[in-house]
From Swiss-Prot:
The keyword rRNA processing does not apply. The gene is rbsD. It catalyses: beta-D-ribopyranose = beta-D-ribofuranose. GO terms for molecular function: D-ribose pyranase activity; intramolecular lyase activity; monosaccharide binding. Homodecamer. Pathway: Carbohydrate metabolism; D-ribose degradation; D-ribose 5-phosphate from beta-D-ribopyranose: step 1/2. PANTHER family: D-RIBOSE PYRANASE. The keyword Cytoplasm applies. This is D-ribose pyranase. Keywords: Carbohydrate metabolism, Cytoplasm, Isomerase.
Length: 132
C-alpha cells in the first residue's frame, strides 16, 4: 500500500504520467467535461468531496508550475484574497481567466477530476512543473 496521501489508483496514475506543462483540472460538480480529457469522477453527493480536499491531496503528489482559476470565482473578494476552496493551498497566486476560457482550456487537459463541490466557479487548472 502507498505511504502517501493519494490512494485513488487512477488519479495516482494520471499524476505520475504528467509531463512538464500538462494540465490537470479539478472541477466542481457542474463543470462540463469535454470528450477529450480522461474523466475521473469522484462526486458522491453534493458537497462530497469538496474541491479543497481534492486539491490538497493532489498538491501533495503533483509538482505545480502555475494554476488558473476563473475570474468569476473571485467576484467581490478583496484584492489578493482567494476563494475559500483554494485559500492557502497554492505556492503562488493563481492566474485568472474568464470561466468560458477555463472551460475551453479544459479540453486540452490530460484529465478532469469531477468533485461533489457545489460552489459556483470552484474549478482550477493545474499546470505540471518539474522537480529538478
Amino acid at each position: 500500500m502507498k505511504r502517501t496521501a493519494l490512494l485513488h489508483a487512477e488519479l495516482s496514475q494520471v499524476i505520475a504520467a504528467l509531463g512538464h506543462g500538462d494540465m490537470l483540472v479539478i472541477g466542481d460538480a457542474g463543470l462540463p467535461i469535454p470528450d477529450g480529457p480522461r474523466r475521473i469522477d469522484l462526486a458522491l453527493t453534493p458537497g462530497i468531496p469538496r474541491v479543497a480536499d481534492v486539491l490538497k491531496v493532489v498538491l501533495s503528489e503533483m509538482q505545480v508550475e502555475r494554476a488558473l482559476i476563473a475570474r468569476e470565482a473571485i467576484g467581490q473578494l478583496p484584492v489578493g484574497q482567494l476563494p475559500a476552496w483554494c485559500e492557502g493551498q497554492l505556492a503562488a497566486l493563481p492566474e485568472t481567466v474568464s470561466h468560458e476560457e477555463l472551460k475551453r482550456l479544459s479540453a486540452r487537459a490530460k484529465a478532469v477530476i469531477r468533485t461533489g463541490e457545489c460552489t459556483p466557479y470552484a474549478n482550477i487548472v493545474l499546470y505540471a512543473g518539474v522537480t529538478f
